[in-house]
UniProtKB/Swiss-Prot annotation:
Protein name in UniProt: Thymidylate synthase
CC per GO annotation: cytosol
One GO MF term attached to the UniProt entry: thymidylate synthase activity
Chief site of localization: cytoplasm
EC number assigned by the record: 2.1.1.45
Length: 97
């Protein structure tokens, strides 16, 4: 399933990172990350947070720089850099159980 407000943004970020890491490991150029949803949903208790998110201006996406020649299995957080990353203040929303 796809929790549009909380889950999908995390999935996009993590799988986009994985796309870059796999391309690097295989010696390939990074292609595109395509995400499809099954059972996409928005929880009613997220509506205020969603309206806040939609009222904000977008920023240009940052660039990912992988600062190592290590294998995908040895890379850690310190080997990664986001260039020109900008963000708005966090929006809190409850996780559905």
């Amino acid at each position: 399933s796809a929790d549009i407000f909380l889950g999908v943004p995390f999935n996009i970020a993590s799988y986009a990172l994985l796309t870059h890491l796999v391309a690097k490991e295989c010696g390939l150029e990074v292609g595109e990350f395509i995400h499809t949803f099954g059972d996409a949903h928005i929880y009613s208790n997220h509506m205020d947070a969603i309206h806040t998110q939609l009222s904000r201006d977008s920023y240009l996406p940052p660039q990912l720089k992988i600062n190592t020649d290590k294998s995908i299995f040895d890379i850690n957080y310190e080997d990664l850099e986001l260039i020109n990353y900008e963000s708005h203040p966090a929006i809190k929303a409850p996780i559905a159980v």
